[in-house]
C-alpha cells in the first residue's frame, strides 16, 4: 500500500528526477514561465515556491541552499535580487499552473507553470503596412545574378 508516500517518481531514477527538477527550476526562474507536462509542473511547484521563500530571506545560507537546487549562479542572483524583492509582501502562492490541454504527439496533459504577478512584456507586432523594396520573383533572381557577377569582376 502507498499510504503517506509523497511525490511522484515520474518514471525516472532519483538522480535523473532531481536533474529534471534542477533544469525545470532553472528555466522557470530564467524565463518566469515554462510549458511542461502537468505531472512535472505539479512536482516542481513546491520546490519553486520554496526557492522564492529562500530568496525573500536573502541571507548567505539561503543563497547556498538555493544553489543546491539551481546550480546556475546568475539565475540564483536574479532570483534573490528581483524575484525575492517582488514577492516581499506575499505570504505564499508564488506560482500558478494553467492547464493547456493535451500534447499532439502522445496526448500527455500539458500545463504552463509561471510566476504570478510577473511583469507583462508586450510582443512587438510586425508592421504589415510596410512593404519590402526588394524585387520579387524573376526580378529578384536577375538582381542576385547581377550582384554576383559584379562581385566577381
Segments the model singles out, each with a brief description of its role:
Residues 1-153:
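Structured, basic alpha/beta domains of bacterial-type, RNA-associated proteins
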Amino acid at each position: 500500500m502507498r499510504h503517506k508516500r509523497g511525490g511522484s517518481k515520474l518514471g525516472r531514477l532519483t538522480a535523473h528526477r532531481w536533474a529534471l527538477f534542477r533544469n525545470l527550476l532553472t528555466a522557470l526562474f530564467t524565463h518566469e514561465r515554462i510549458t511542461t507536462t502537468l505531472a512535472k509542473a505539479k512536482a516542481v511547484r513546491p520546490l519553486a515556491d520554496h526557492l522564492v521563500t529562500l530568496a525573500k530571506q536573502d541571507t548567505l545560507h539561503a543563497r547556498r541552499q538555493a544553489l543546491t537546487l539551481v546550480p546556475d549562479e546568475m539565475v540564483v542572483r536574479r532570483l534573490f535580487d528581483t524575484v525575492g524583492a517582488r514577492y516581499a509582501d506575499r505570504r505564499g502562492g508564488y506560482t500558478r499552473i494553467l492547464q493547456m490541454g493535451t500534447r499532439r504527439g502522445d496526448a500527455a496533459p500539458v500545463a504552463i507553470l509561471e510566476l504570478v504577478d510577473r511583469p507583462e512584456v508586450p510582443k512587438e507586432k510586425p508592421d504589415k503596412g510596410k512593404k519590402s523594396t526588394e524585387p520579387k520573383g524573376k526580378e529578384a533572381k536577375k538582381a542576385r545574378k547581377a550582384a554576383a557577377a559584379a562581385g566577381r569582376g
